[in-house]
Structure formats: structure tokens, C-alpha cells
């Protein structure tokens, strides 16, 4: 019984260069490059225009690593070819974002502004005063940067003010009952 995810081949799109040297895997594409160390017990090989991963044995930890390695490598191939992005929406009177150099300056109703500088490999774009786009090749880092920005002023449940993902739905609460 092999890992259902791990046994699926990873298609290599045109324009992506893949190298496997021992346990080191690297992918290079139009959006950038990334590398990953394949866990022990898992071997990766390029067959035609696909990457195939095989597990050394059928033990539970090896099966788990098999699926994990395949998911990470497939994400890397997609990331260097297409890239990943998350869009954040700023809701609230006076709340806005302004591009400042490489980073973004947020006005979120505090007595001070908050400046966010992106880590290496991540780009931050302000499409308008109320929308910020986080882009990069690494899915995990894009999600983490977006989560850190959202955490600056998480949406509150009464009026929905704050920073939210563009596809996020805020569950609203009823306010105080009037007389």
C-alpha cells in the first residue's frame, strides 16, 4: 500500500528546468528558482517530462514523507512556473495601504502607521488603497506573509473592519439590542 498522493507523477511544464542530484531537488522557471532536500527513504527521478517519486519501503512514516515530498515538489514546480498570490482587502473608514519603496505602509486606525517590508522572494503590490497583493514562488511564504499582514488588524465581527483575504467571509454578530 503506497501513498496515494506520493505515487502520482509531477508534470514538468515547458520552461521549467528540474535537477535532481542525490537527495537535492531544484527547480528553475520564469518566476524564479527553488530547492528542496528530499527526505531519506524517498527517491526522485525524472522520466521524460515527469518527476516520479518512489518510497524505499511501505512503513507508515515513509508513506507520509512520500506524499509530503510529492506535494512540496509539485508546489515548487507550479511556483517557479506560475507563482502564487494572495489578495488582501482592507475594510474600514480611513483604513488604507500606500506603497513605500519595496514595502507597504498601512494606516489602520492606530495612533501610528505600520510599515511591512517583504522577505526575499516576495513582492507586495498595492492595487488600490484598499487592496494588497502578496506574490512569490513559495506557497508557504506567500501564505505566511499574507497571514502576518492580516494579523495587523484582523477583521472584527460587528462591522467587519480590518484586513481580510479577498475570498474570506466574515461571520457577523448582532450588535447590542436597542430599547
UniProtKB/Swiss-Prot annotation:
This protein's record includes keyword Protease: no
Alphabetical GO biological process terms: cytoplasmic translation
Record-linked PROSITE patterns: RIBOSOMAL_L6_1 (PS00525)
Swiss-Prot/TrEMBL keywords: Ribonucleoprotein, Ribosomal protein, RNA-binding, rRNA-binding
Pfam families reported for this sequence: Ribosomal_L6
GO molecular function term, any single one: rRNA binding
Domain of life: Bacteria
SUPFAM superfamilies per UniProt: Ribosomal protein L6
InterPro entries named among the record's database cross-references: Ribosomal_uL6-like (IPR000702), Ribosomal_uL6-like_a/b-dom_sf (IPR036789), Ribosomal_uL6_a/b-dom (IPR020040), Ribosomal_uL6_bac-type (IPR019906), Ribosomal_uL6_CS (IPR002358)
Cellular component, GO, one term: cytosolic large ribosomal subunit
Family to which this protein belongs: Belongs to the universal ribosomal protein uL6 family.
Listed HAMAP family: Ribosomal_uL6_B (MF_01365_B)
Subunit structure, interactors included: Part of the 50S ribosomal subunit.
Function: This protein binds to the 23S rRNA, and is important in its secondary structure. It is located near the subunit interface in the base of the L7/L12 stalk, and near the tRNA binding site of the peptidyltransferase center.
PANTHER family the record matches: 60S/50S RIBOSOMAL PROTEIN L6/L9, LARGE RIBOSOMAL SUBUNIT PROTEIN UL6M
Protein name: Large ribosomal subunit protein uL6
The species this protein was found in: Bifidobacterium longum (strain NCC 2705)
Amino acid at each position: 500500500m503506497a501513498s496515494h498522493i506520493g505515487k502520482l507523477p509531477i508534470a514538468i511544464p515547458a520552461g521549467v528546468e528540474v535537477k535532481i542530484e542525490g537527495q537535492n531537488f531544484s527547480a528553475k522557471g520564469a518566476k524564479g528558482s527553488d530547492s528542496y532536500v528530499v527526505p531519506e527513504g524517498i527517491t526522485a527521478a525524472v522520466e521524460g517530462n515527469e518527476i516520479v517519486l518512489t518510497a524505499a519501503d511501505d512503513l507508515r512514516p515513509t508513506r507520509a514523507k512520500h506524499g509530503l515530498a510529492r506535494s512540496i515538489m509539485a508546489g515548487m514546480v507550479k511556483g517557479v512556473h506560475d507563482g502564487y498570490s494572495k489578495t488582501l482587502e482592507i475594510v474600514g473608514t480611513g483604513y488604507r495601504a500606500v506603497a513605500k519603496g519595496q514595502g507597504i505602509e498601512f494606516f489602520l486606525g492606530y495612533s501610528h502607521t505600520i510599515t511591512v517590508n517583504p522577505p526575499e522572494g516576495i513582492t507586495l503590490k498595492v492595487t488600490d488603497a484598499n487592496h494588497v497583493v502578496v506574490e512569490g514562488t513559495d506557497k508557504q511564504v506567500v501564505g505566511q506573509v499574507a497571514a502576518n499582514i492580516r494579523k495587523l488588524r484582523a477583521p472584527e465581527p460587528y462591522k467587519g473592519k480590518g484586513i481580510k483575504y479577498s475570498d474570506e467571509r466574515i461571520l457577523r454578530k448582532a450588535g447590542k439590542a436597542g430599547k
